[in-house]
Amino acid sequence: EGVRLVQARGQAMSQVKTGGMTAILGLDGQTVETLCAEVASTGLVQVANWNSPFQTVVSGEFRALEAVGTLSKERGAKRVVQLNVSGPFHSRLMEPAAQAFAEVVQDLELRVCHTPVLSNDGQSMLQDPGDIRRSMVRQITGPVRFTDQLHTLVRMGVTEFVELSPESLLIPLARRSQPNLQFTLVSDGGMV
């Protein structure tokens, strides 16, 4: 069932071909969010990923991405990097994908989770099947608040961060936000 969902989500998201994503390093997320509002007349652009205190990813239409990138440099960003991605993920431009995925998720048989799942909003702990369905759809157009997720987990008493990945992508971001956590990478070759 999980593989079918991943395939359906990917298929729905691949249909949205307008727009992209840009990483902004050296400015805090609130500043980047303000800059997005300042360039709104050029097109849709919004914060897509709150990765670390000074790394934020924006998503939107190309003209607006260019405008927010230029303004970010003027306001002191250390780097602005256009990401090599196929769409404007975690933005309102993905609404057609969210609607298509909602149709798939509505018939999904889910049970109440024994272990709560932390939502992309960084604060909501989900167990109810209806809440999980709504969150699965919302995360297609909504931002990933990774920094908030880490803060929430630390407040809950989490002391170790385990990344399951061929290479360490999240650990460097997590370390910037929560340096006191213990970090472990589990890759194809075992624990690193």
Predicted regions and their residues:
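Alpha/beta catalytic cores of group-transfer enzymes, especially the acyltransferase/condensing modules
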Residues: 1-143, 172
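Flexible, low-complexity segments
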Residues: 138-192
